[in-house]
Amino acid sequence: MLRTHYSSEITEELNGKKVKVAGWVQEVKDLGGIKFIWIRDREGIVQVTAPKKKVPQEIFKLIPKLNSEDVIVVEGIVNFTPKAKLGFEIIPEKLEVISKAKTPLPLDPTGKVKAELDTRLDNRFMDLRNPRVMSIFKIRSSVFRATREFFYKEGFIEIHTPKIIATATEGGTELFPLKYFENDAFLAQSPQLYKQMMMSTGLDKVFEIGPIFRAEEHNTTRHLNEAWSIDAEMAFIESEEEVMDLLERLILYVINYVRENNEKELKILEFELNEPKKPFPRITYDEALEILSDLGKEIPWGEDIDTEGEKLLGKYMLENEGAELYFIYRYPSEAKPFYIMKYEDKPEVCKAFDLEYRGVEISSGGQREHRHDILVEQIREKGLNPESFEFYLRAFEYGMPPHGGFGLGAERLIMRMLDIGNIREVILFPRDRRRLVP
């Protein structure tokens, strides 16, 4: 390797010893008889100090020729001293320029000179050199790692379902069509039907982390056309509340994992991530509509709670319940997909829920209808043709246990967890209504 240590690995035990560091030139300072380089790597900053009388002359002459963002390797002796900004410095014995950076730069990776979001996204490779931006993606990595840890500890089996499909998952029109040889196909908007089919196999508890594609023309700060979904499904449940319990445990596990393992990144972001109030409050759809009515927002029964309503409800729950996260459940059947089970004694209401995070829906789930004949009827009620779902329905004809699950939007979880205003900030190369490159 060209480096022996990251910046964060240089400790007092290395004082007086030789190391090799590598990274990008963040700053060069020339004070005549002494020159400085600050090198940035993934873990932080290293100060290189070059006194004219202590370093080879070729190094001393090379330093002023360095540009910001040149990639260099420095080999030298570690010197811990209170005179150094970071508490230590490296006295160089060798300096190699690996790659020169063009000037001017498309944006300032230190963030001192602000850039518009579009400029940043057009130059994402350089945007991530900003420690704040990099911290977001280190935390994103932790979210996915913690998610997998949680599911394995809970006895779940990871699956991978097709992303090229022949049938709309929920019968909607928000699909990206594509040509699949001589057939018409679509990009998958959800693994819903496939994870339900897995409940007929005996795997019992499955999860998937993968991309979903939705051809929604929304151009908002919380919508993406390609996003990552965390999906789970489990068999032999008695009610949707067991699924809500599972989702609550997952969210708490992920947040606490980030709090424990990403202290440095949270500090860079200047953000204090608190453990949510638990248990998460649970309010029915009817109760949510009553609260909104008291706040002057009327929503006809049976309709989805719109963005304004979600925001009002989020503010109310925070101020009155101290809750950032809360469930809304027992939705009108007409507002939810065909595969959600209805209440026997009140079929106009179904066993569905949403999880809201400060006024933004981050997850939907519920108990599924596992009885074949009723499921077929519910497909018809939505104006869909059961023949289009034959591959899915077959799994319900040969022994299907009661089951339920959820889909959790990874980007929405991360943006709300870190209180980031635009969902495009938490995905590397966002795909939205207007952005297809890079």
From Swiss-Prot:
Ligand binding (Mg(2+) 2): 361, 364
UniProt record, GO biological process: aspartyl-tRNA aminoacylation
GO cellular component terms listed in the entry, alphabetical order: aminoacyl-tRNA synthetase multienzyme complex; cytosol
Amino-acid positions noted as binding L-aspartate in the UniProt annotation, renumbered to this chain: 170, 214, 364, 368
Classification via Gene3D superfamilies: Bira Bifunctional Protein, Domain 2, Nucleic acid-binding proteins
Pfam family, one: tRNA-synt_2
Domain of life: Archaea
Annotated region (Aspartate), positions in chain: 192-195
Catalytic reactions of this protein: tRNA(Asp) + L-aspartate + ATP = L-aspartyl-tRNA(Asp) + AMP + diphosphate
InterPro entries: Aa-tRNA-synt_II (IPR004364), aa-tRNA-synth_II (IPR006195), aa-tRNA-synth_II/BPL/LPL (IPR045864), Asp-tRNA_synthase_2 (IPR004523), Asp/Asn-tRNA-synth_IIb (IPR002312), NA-bd_OB-fold (IPR012340), NA-bd_OB_tRNA (IPR004365)
GO MF annotation: an example: magnesium ion binding
Cofactor binding remark: Binds 3 Mg(2+) cations per subunit. The strongest magnesium site (Mg1) is bound to the beta- and gamma-phosphates of ATP and four water molecules complete its coordination sphere.
UniProt: Mg(2+) 3 binding residues: 361
Compartments, as annotated in UniProt: Cytoplasm
Site (Important for tRNA discrimination): 85
Protein family: Belongs to the class-II aminoacyl-tRNA synthetase family. Type 2 subfamily.
Described purpose of this protein according to its UniProt entry: Catalyzes the attachment of L-aspartate to tRNA(Asp) in a two-step reaction: L-aspartate is first activated by ATP to form Asp-AMP and then transferred to the acceptor end of tRNA(Asp).
Designated name of the protein: Aspartate--tRNA(Asp) ligase
Organism expressing this protein natively: Pyrococcus abyssi (strain GE5 / Orsay)
